[in-house]
């Protein structure tokens, strides 16, 4: 029976590497997958899933008004799994579409993304995945400053911590840092 999986982690926790690994494992057995990512994430190009270690692959971009259920249902070849990167940027309707893919098409969906933003608020996609997912797993990484488990994301600009501003600002290592709670509130910058 298919399930909706939500795997979250801070920046640099290996979420995209995990997607690429899962896709490889399915495809190695001749089982097709669909990889999708938020259309908002254009760091490495539109419709590209890219890890910080240099692995990359094309993906179907998801806009907030995309009907993901119909897209998957109308594919000529039914996928064995749907893999979603940057799931924090999904709309509520996108997440409900993913649940329908699982429940009505019996296709497992694995969504990967951040849980909370730099102000420690849930992203819209994360909130609804936490509500609807059958299985929720944390992908762990360590705090950049002390090597404890990182649970938060610190936004920096010009080497200074930032706690206010727009929720969505596409960046990379240069603007977001995985940190523990202590170093979120008292960064060693």
Swiss-Prot record:
Binding-site residues for Zn(2+), renumbered to this chain: 143, 146, 180, 183
UniProt keyword Glycoprotein, yes or no: no
Gene Ontology annotations for the cellular component aspect, listed alphabetically: cytosol
Annotated protein name in UniProt: Thymidine kinase
Record field: catalytic activity: thymidine + ATP = dTMP + ADP + H(+)
HAMAP family, A to Z: Thymidine_kinase (MF_00124)
Family in the record: Belongs to the thymidine kinase family.
GO biological process entries: DNA biosynthetic process; thymidine metabolic process
Subcellular compartments: Cytoplasm
Keywords: ATP-binding, Cytoplasm, DNA synthesis, Kinase, Metal-binding, Nucleotide-binding, Transferase, Zinc
Binding site for ATP: 9-16, 85-88
GO molecular function, one term: zinc ion binding
């Amino acid at each position: 029976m298919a399930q909706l999986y939500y795997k979250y982690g801070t920046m640099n926790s290996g979420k995209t590497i995990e997607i690429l690994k899962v896709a490889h494992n399915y495809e190695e057995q001749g089982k097709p997958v669909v990889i999708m990512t938020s259309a908002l994430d254009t760091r490495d190009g539109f419709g590209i899933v890219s890890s910080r270690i240099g692995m990359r692959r094309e993906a179907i971009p998801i806009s907030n008004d995309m009907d993901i259920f119909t897209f998957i249902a109308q594919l000529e070849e039914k996928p064995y799994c749907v893999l979603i990167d940057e799931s924090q940027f999904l709309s509520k309707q996108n997440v409900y579409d993913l649940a329908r893919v699982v429940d009505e098409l019996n296709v497992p969906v694995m969504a990967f993304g951040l849980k909370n933003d730099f102000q420690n608020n849930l992203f819209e996609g994360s909130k609804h995945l936490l509500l609807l997912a059958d299985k929720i797993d944390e992908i762990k990484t360590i705090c950049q400053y002390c090597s404890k488990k990182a649970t938060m994301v610190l936004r920096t600009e010009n080497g200074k911590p930032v706690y206010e501003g727009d929720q969505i600002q596409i960046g990379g290592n240069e603007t977001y840092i995985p940190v523990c709670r202590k170093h979120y509130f008292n960064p060693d910058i």
